[in-house]
Amino acid sequence: MISVATAECFTHGKIGIKIHKMACGYRELEKDPNYGIINGNVFVMASMFLPSKKGIESILNVKLPEPDYVFKYSKAYTQENDILVAKMVANALKNKLKCNIAISSTAGVGKGAVCILTDNNEYVFTSDVYGDLIKGENILKRQTNGLNKSFDTFVEILKKEYGLK
């Protein structure tokens, strides 16, 4: 069984929840074309929604850079720093839980960033939707796109690296 853990911000823990539902055999997802790839092959160790810098640092024992923008209690970075932070969080999560695959997401101003870290490779990508957390622009569109792109990438990794079909 392939172990997975997520520490998510702009995807609100939805990547991990979707993987968990398929892994556990939720009937409403049985018709999904990727159900058979995940069910019986993957389990979720943890799926966390971590919007704050303090929460991430406390739980994962990692020191993140100071946010580029002030936004209530949540962290908000530039596109460049979102990529850096996504990598840092995925590495900290993988080190902490010793899972096979660690997934992290973060988004401030820009397209956000997702890092999927496996035992062999690091995959870093953005959503296809520009959003601005500070101004509240395109937040839900970016989230939906990031969730779908992350899940599709996760499935492709299972096929490519783990030979699942």
Curated annotation (Swiss-Prot):
- Protein's recorded name: UPF0254 protein MmarC5_0742
Report the family membership: Belongs to the UPF0254 family.
InterPro entries per the record? HcgF (IPR009625)
Coiled-coil spans are: none
User: Cross-referenced Pfam families, in alphabetical order?
Assistant: HcgF (PF06787)
Taxonomic lineage per UniProt? Archaea, Methanobacteriati, Methanobacteriota, Methanomada group, Methanococci
Signal peptide extent: none
- Species this protein is from: Methanococcus maripaludis (strain C5 / ATCC BAA-1333)
